[in-house]
Structures are given as structure tokens and as C-alpha cells.
């Protein structure tokens, strides 16, 4: 029984390692350029192990999206410990700014996957990528709602659209300063908002 439990634990650990590797490599290289061998190399496992856990590249993409979702849930759970919605939203923006060098090289992990997947005909995985972004939008809207800001869904859309835009430009221009400058503008915008304010704060 112990051996069986150990085997299952090792298998689960290996799958998690492969999933994390898939998320990193797909973010850095994109879907089309990434091979299963790339994932194996990043996870430091034989390529046969990748085939054992993930039969197709689409399964790896799905696993990477679940990794992004888990990372987002971990991030928002940490932010939820902060005392006020304004604090939480500002800390979210600060987390984006802290990732400026990664954004300059590779863009937003989920956003870049969503754009790449949208070009495919089947339309299933792009919906899954959209669901991760929707999760962030919903959390952000909930913060504005709790804060008492009118039109919380609109404010959430403004904030997340700004993030996607600054990630795209930071990546396209290979300039981390774009993320810093635009992130600072968002922090100032959040500081200017008060409950009962109109949308443009």
C-alpha cells in the first residue's frame, strides 16, 4: 500500500512539475513554437513522461491555463487579506508593475495565450483562456462594488483593459518603463476614486 501511495504522490508531483513547465514555456515561446520536448527539457523529465501525462499539445495548453488560474487564485487570495478594496486593487497594480521585465519579454501570460488561441478555428481553448480573464474581471468588479464605486463592472473593465494594453505595449516596445509609467497612472487613478464618484474619477 505504501509503495502504491508513494507512486501516486510521485506521479502527482511530476504532473504538477510538467504543468508549471508548460505554463512557463508556452508563455515564453507561444503555442506554435513550443514542442513537447521543450516542456520535457524545462521540467527536467524524459520526453516520454510528457506523452504519458499529456497526449496532445492542446492538453498541455489546457494544463497551462489551469496553472494560470491557480496562480490568479493564489494572488487574489493574498490580496483579499489586505484591509480595503482600494488597498487590494493598488496591490494588484503593484504586482503587475513588479512583473514589468517579464512583460517586456513575453507579455501577459493569459492574454498572450488568449490572442494566440483566438486565431484557431475550434474555439474551445480560447474560451478557457477567456474564462481566466473573466475570473480576474469578476474579482476586480467585486472590489469596486465593495468599495462603493458606482458602475463597478465598468471600472473593472477599465482597469483590466489598461493592464492588457500596457502589457501588450511593454512587450511590443520591449520597454519595462511602459508598465511602470502606466501602472503609476493607474495607482493615481485608484487614489482619486471615492465612493459615489463617476466613472472617470
Where are these regions (language model features)?
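Short, basic, alpha-helical segments at the C-terminal edge of helix-turn-helix-like DNA-binding modules
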Residues: 66-72
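Hydrophobic alpha-helical segments that form the core
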Residues: 110-115, 151-172, 185-189
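Hydrophobic alpha-helical bundle segments that form small-molecule/ligand-binding pockets
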Residues: 120-122, 130-156, 190-200
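Helix-turn-helix
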Residues: 17, 21-59, 63
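Hydrophobic alpha-helical connector segments
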Residues: 63, 74-106, 156-159
Amino acid at each position: 500500500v505504501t509503495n502504491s501511495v508513494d507512486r501516486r504522490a510521485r506521479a502527482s508531483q511530476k504532473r504538477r512539475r510538467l504543468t508549471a513547465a508548460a505554463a512557463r514555456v508556452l508563455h515564453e515561446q507561444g503555442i506554435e513554437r513550443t514542442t513537447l520536448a521543450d516542456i520535457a527539457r524545462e521540467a527536467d523529465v524524459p520526453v516520454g513522461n510528457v506523452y504519458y501525462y499529456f497526449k496532445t499539445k492542446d492538453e498541455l495548453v489546457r494544463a497551462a491555463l489551469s496553472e494560470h488560474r491557480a496562480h490568479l487564485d493564489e494572488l487574489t487570495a493574498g490580496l483579499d487579506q489586505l484591509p480595503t478594496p482600494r488597498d487590494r486593487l493598488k496591490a494588484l497594480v503593484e504586482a503587475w508593475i513588479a512583473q514589468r521585465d517579464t512583460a517586456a519579454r513575453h507579455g501577459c501570460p493569459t492574454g498572450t495565450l488568449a490572442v494566440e488561441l483566438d486565431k484557431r478555428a475550434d474555439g474551445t481553448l480560447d474560451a478557457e483562456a477567456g474564462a481566466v480573464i473573466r475570473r480576474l474581471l469578476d474579482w476586480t468588479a467585486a472590489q469596486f462594488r465593495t468599495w462603493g464605486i458606482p458602475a463597478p463592472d465598468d471600472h473593472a473593465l477599465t482597469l483590466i483593459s489598461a493592464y492588457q494594453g500596457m502589457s501588450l505595449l511593454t512587450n511590443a516596445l520591449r520597454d519595462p518603463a511602459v508598465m511602470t509609467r502606466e501602472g503609476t497612472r493607474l495607482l493615481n487613478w485608484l487614489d482619486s476614486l471615492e465612493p459615489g464618484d463617476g466613472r472617470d474619477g
